Amino acid sequence: MIIGTGVDIVEIERIATLIKRQERAIKHFLTTDEQQLLHGKSETRQAEMVAGRFAAKEAGAKALGTGIGAVLSFLDMEILPNHLGKPVMTIKNEVYSKLDLDPTRVHIHVSISHSQSHAIAQVIVEER
């Protein structure tokens, strides 16, 4: 059963500007492991990666029906590539408790795409 779907789009330049102005802003959006993915990447690629994860986390919050706020923060969600490079979203167990969901029964589908100017993400949250 599908619990919810979410889509978000973000301007990559907006994220690039934010990163340049406030480097610590990345720590607000990305977990430590997600930040590690940025090492060795060009500024352009870093902005794309941060924008894509920002959009995916916003989409995930929409799919869960909470938005970003009291129940769910950017750091409650983590998006890391699997062995094939596919983005996999995990959510902290405390969030599942707040939402009265069983984490062993929830599957999250994530798709992230970029153009030169935008990053877009779609998330589907499914309970099995």
UniProtKB/Swiss-Prot annotation:
GO cellular component, one term: cytoplasm
Catalytic class of the enzyme: transferase
Keywords tagged on the record: Cytoplasm, Fatty acid biosynthesis, Fatty acid metabolism, Lipid biosynthesis, Lipid metabolism, Magnesium, Metal-binding, Transferase
Family matches, as InterPro entries: 4-PPantetheinyl_Trfase_dom (IPR008278), 4-PPantetheinyl_Trfase_dom_sf (IPR037143), ACPS (IPR002582), Ppantetheine-prot_Trfase_dom (IPR004568)
Cell compartments where the protein resides: Cytoplasm
GO molecular function, one term: magnesium ion binding
Amino-acid positions noted as binding Mg(2+) in the UniProt annotation, renumbered to this chain: D8, E58
GO BP annotation list: fatty acid biosynthetic process
Annotated catalysed reactions: apo-[ACP] + CoA = holo-[ACP] + adenosine 3',5'-bisphosphate + H(+)
Pfam families given in the database record: ACPS
Enzyme Commission code(s) on record: 2.7.8.7
Needed co-factor(s): Mg(2+)
Family membership: Belongs to the P-Pant transferase superfamily. AcpS family.
Function, in words: Transfers the 4'-phosphopantetheine moiety from coenzyme A to a Ser of acyl-carrier-protein.
Name of the featured protein: Holo-[acyl-carrier-protein] synthase
Gene designation per UniProt: acpS
